[in-house]
Amino acid sequence: ERINSMAYLPNLIFFFLLAAAVGLFTRNFNRISRNIKLGKDVDRNDRPKLRMKYMLRVAFGQSKMVSRPIAGALHLLVYVGFILINIELLEIIVDGLTGAHRIFAPLLGSSLYNFLIASFEVLALLVLVTVVIFWSRRNVMKIKRFWKPEMRGWPKKDADFILYFEVVLMVLFLSMNATDSLLQQANIESYTKAGSFPISQYLLPLFADFSVETRMC
C-alpha cells in the first residue's frame, strides 16, 4: 500500500505546483483588473468592427508589417508559435494530474499526433531563433529606437525577461521530448510510444548517460 501511495506523489506535487501557479496568475489578473477599473467609463460601442480590426492589427504585430515587415513577421511567428505550442501544455497538464502519458495520442491517432508534435518542435526551434534575433537587436545591435529614454529602465527589463522566459519554455519543451524519446526507446512501462521528434532528437546525447529515474524526473 505504501508503494502504491508513493506512486501518486508526483501527481500530488504537480497538482500543488499547478494550483500555486493558477493562484499567482489569478492574483495578478485581479490586481491588473482593479487598476484598469480605476479609470472612468467611456462609451466605446461605436464602430465595433473597425475597433476590433485595429486591436487585432496591433496585438498580432500586423501594423508593423507595413513600416517594418521583417520585425512584424518575426513578431507574428513568435505569437503563433507560442500559442500553438501551448496546445501541448493542455496534454502536459492532463498527464501531470492523471499520471497518464501522452493521453491525446490515442485520441488523435498516431499520424495526426506525430505530425502535431513534429510541427510543435519545428515551431519551438523557430521561436528560439527569433528570440535570439530579438535579443540581439535590443542588446547587441543597439538599434536606436530601443535606446530612447522611454524605452529604458523597466520597459527594457520587461522585454528582456519575456525573451528569457520564451527561451526557457522552448528549451524545456524540447528537453522533455528528448528524455521522453529515450524512455520510449528503453521500453519503460506505461510510456506510450508516440510522437515524432525531428528537433529534440539532436539533444539525445545530452541525456544518454542519465539514469532512467533521472530522465523520468
Regions found by a protein language model. Name each.
Residues 2-217:
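Membrane-embedded alpha-helical bundles of multi-pass integral membrane proteins
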